[in-house]
Structure formats: C-alpha cells, structure tokens
Amino acid sequence: MGIGRVTQVMGPVIDVRFEHNEVPKINNALVIDVPKEEGTIQLTLEVALQLGDDVVRTIAMDSTDGVQRGMDVKDTGKEISVPVGDETLGRVFNVLGETIDLKEEISDSVRRDPIHRQAPAFDELSTEVQILETGIKVVDLLAPYIKGGKIGLFGGAGVGKTVLIQELINNIAQEHGGISVFAGVGERTREGNDLYFEMSDSGVIKKTAMVFGQMNEPPGARMRVALSGLTMAEYFRDEQGQDVLLFIDNIFRFTQAGSEVSALLGRMPSAVGYQPTLATEMGQLQERITSTTKGSVTSIQAVFVPADDYTDPAPATAFAHLDATTNLERKLTEMGIYPAVDPLASTSRALEPSIVGQEHYEVARDVQSTLQKYRELQDIIAILGMDELSDEDKQTVERARRIQFFLSQNFHVAEQFTGQKGSYVPVKTTVANFKDILDGKYDHIPEDAFRLVGSMDDVIAKAKDMGVEV
C-alpha cells in the first residue's frame, strides 16, 4: 500500500501527494495517525478527486484538528466498509462501522461490505405490489405505502417528520416483526439518543441496526452515513432474503452535506448553490433502495423542505424517486391536527382500485373531493360567513370538518407529551369509518369529538363523555 504526504488542509478537505505509481483510486479509504492529547487517533479520509501531479483531494470522515502538512497518509487499498449481518442488530454505529454505544467492539471476524456498490441489475428487480399497513389513518386511507417501495415524508422545520418516522418504526417494526435499519443523517443527536432508549425499552432494538452521522459531524460523515446504513440493509435483503425496513432521517441533510463537500472540492455550484452532481448522487443512493426477487427494502425517508418551498432542487430531486409521498403542512399544525398530513397533496401510486380494492379507492376519492370542496368554499365563508351557503354546501362543510379532525390521531410515541394512549387503526376499520362519515351516519356528533382519536368507537366514547346522546 502506498504512503503519501499531506500537502494542504482546507477544513474537512485534505490534499495528499503520493509517489507516481502509487496514486490511490477514487473512493479508496486513506488513514492518518493524528496525535491528540488523549493519544493517537486514526483519521479516515476518502479519495474524491485525482488532481494530477500525483495529488489526490480527499474528504475527512471526522474532525481534521491536529492534521499538519507533511504528515504521512497510508492508502488502505480498499473502500470504506461496514460490518453486516446479525451481529449488527441491537447496535449503534458511526459512518465507518465503528460501534458508538459503549458496548463491546464488533469482532474482526465479522464480514464487512464496502459502502459503494452497484444498484441491483434490472432483471433482479421485483415488480409485485403489496400494501404495507401502518395503522395511521390518513396514510392508509389516502396515500398507502407499498411494501418494498420508497416513501418520502416531506415537511418544513418542526412540523412532525421525526415523530411520524418514530411512530412508523413503532407500528411497522412491531407489527411487521422484521429487521429494521435506521440511518440518522445530519439530524439532532438528542433525537437519536431518545430513539435508541425508546427502542431499547420496547424491545424493537433487538431487530434494529442504527447508524448515525449527526449534525455536529463533518460533511464527509453526513454524506456517507446513508450509504453505510443502506449497505447493512442490502446484506439482509440479498444474503438472508429478508424484508427489511430502512428509515432515513433526513435525506435532505445528505444533499446538504454533498453541497458543502462539492464547494470545498472546487466544483462550480448549480441552481440555488447546490452541487452540480445533485441528481447523480441522489440517484446512486435511491436506485440501491429497491426490492429484488430475493427480498425487499422498504424505505421511509424524512425530507426537510427548506422554507416550505417544494420547488427547491433538493426535495424536488427526491420526489422523482418515490412511490408514495406524505406531505406535512404547517397550517394543520396551527389548527392542532396531528399528524399534520396534507390529505390533498399527499400521493401514492398504490391508490388504484386494482391494488387497494374498489371500496377503499372510492372512499378515499370521496374524502379528497369533500375536502377539496371545503377548501374552495373557505374564501366564501371568510367573506360572507356560513349563513350565505346553500344547505348542501353547509352539509359538505360540516362533514369535511369532521373528516379533517378524524384524520388526526394519537401516537404511541407522543404519549408522554399528550397523556393520551396511542392508537393503531387497521385499514378495514379506517375505510368503514370514513364511509360512515361520508354517508352522514355521524352528523349528530359534535366535530370536537373527532379530534385526536383512533377509530369511531373512540369518537362515540368521547361524545358520551361530552354529554351527547349517541
């Protein structure tokens, strides 16, 4: 293996000169021994560019504090690799596959796979469509998730993406019982910490591998940690034939880290300052998240929408790869409707009669058309008031408000904040309940009884507590 010398340090980007016949390949991992107060630390770099004159430009996976010009850099001759297999379950890793949960180290005998891999070949892909029940009414009814599909949770800051992802982990991982991989990409360390302890308490952690590259880490780690998590998920799919759940929070931070690195590498920025390779990088990640004839990877990705602008290149690029989108809307959080999922903007290619069945399809479309009519009438109500509406329009508004409130739901993961038990509602119950609301069966129950409940049984119980005869 070649030995090079540091020639330049620019934050997380380091230039290294090698001998003429020893220049490392793109994506190779290099290591530097950096002296620190607590002892020598090994810093891993990844080759990003070959600049000519036997110099390579690399991205550091950790802090470059203490790195000086002239230091020796060793080429490992291989790419960054992470441990895979059953030994990863119940453990927490960083981008390099090192354990960070203060338990014993993973044995050297455990298989390690490189994080850069080709997407599965076209003839290996599976085209079967099966619905994945989440127990969340608004999702199951209006934008159902596909087993082995890619799902995006879109929303601005603080509208509930992480809470929704935690509820999905709670519901699907427990109901589905399969293996899950959670990749924390550039999000808050506190949230990752809370999630780890919650999953430990519920026992779900035994079937989960967690990989973190959080907000405080250099862009190199944030850019590569999603690939580390995906590599672990791919092993369970390809070698064990499992149906794997891959949670990524947050895919926007993957793009953001790529943008930081791109500027430091000296590439010309593209639209809104993003990297010119945005679509390529997103494609390389997303094309690997897929279902094959051996097993499936169902991915649920939180996508931060900067300034609530859906035309921003980062969320717009992610949109193109998804089978279902769950859009979170700030206006709904202001109305106290949680989860704040926009029932008209959320989409799924599974909402077809041939997939969900005729009754489910018709109820979902009727719910959406009722809500759309209500949205159109809101301007008239704001200017002239409810009294100016026809009787038919008044009925539409009243039913739409009941539907809007009934789309809200208590979450298991929010019990400590709300003091109310979470609810899991099967799809059949959801469809039947909304059909009854549309048919006017519950017009006599006040709309407040529909807020933050599970099934219609909860609404009736709440109405009785309010002193209403049901």
UniProtKB/Swiss-Prot annotation:
CDD domains: ATP-synt_F1_beta_C (cd18110), ATP-synt_F1_beta_N (cd18115), F1-ATPase_beta_CD (cd01133). Pfam families: ATP-synt_ab, ATP-synt_ab_N, ATP-synt_VA_C. Its EC number is 7.1.2.2. InterPro entries: AAA+_ATPase, ATP-synt_VA_C, ATP_synth_F1_bsu, ATPase_a/bsu_AS, ATPase_alpha/beta_chains, ATPase_F1/V1/A1_a/bsu_N, ATPase_F1/V1/A1_a/bsu_N_sf, ATPase_F1/V1/A1_a/bsu_nucl-bd. PROSITE patterns: ATPASE_ALPHA_BETA. Keywords: ATP synthesis, ATP-binding, Cell membrane, CF(1), Hydrogen ion transport, Ion transport, Membrane, Nucleotide-binding, Translocase, Transport. SMART domains: AAA (SM00382). It is a peripheral membrane protein. It catalyses: ATP + H2O + 4 H(+)(in) = ADP + phosphate + 5 H(+)(out). GO terms for molecular function: ATP binding; ATP hydrolysis activity; proton-transporting ATP synthase activity, rotational mechanism. Its main location: membrane. ATP binds at G155, G156, A157, G158, V159, G160, K161, T162. GO terms for cellular component: plasma membrane; proton-transporting ATP synthase complex. It is found in: Cell membrane. Belongs to the ATPase alpha/beta chains family. F-type ATPases have 2 components, CF(1) - the catalytic core - and CF(0) - the membrane proton channel. CF(1) has five subunits: alpha(3), beta(3), gamma(1), delta(1), epsilon(1). CF(0) has three main subunits: a(1), b(2) and c(9-12). The alpha and beta chains form an alternating ring which encloses part of the gamma chain. CF(1) is attached to CF(0) by a central stalk formed by the gamma and epsilon chains, while a peripheral stalk is formed by the delta and b chains. PANTHER family: ATP SYNTHASE, ATP SYNTHASE SUBUNIT BETA, MITOCHONDRIAL. Produces ATP from ADP in the presence of a proton gradient across the membrane. The catalytic sites are hosted primarily by the beta subunits. This is ATP synthase subunit beta.
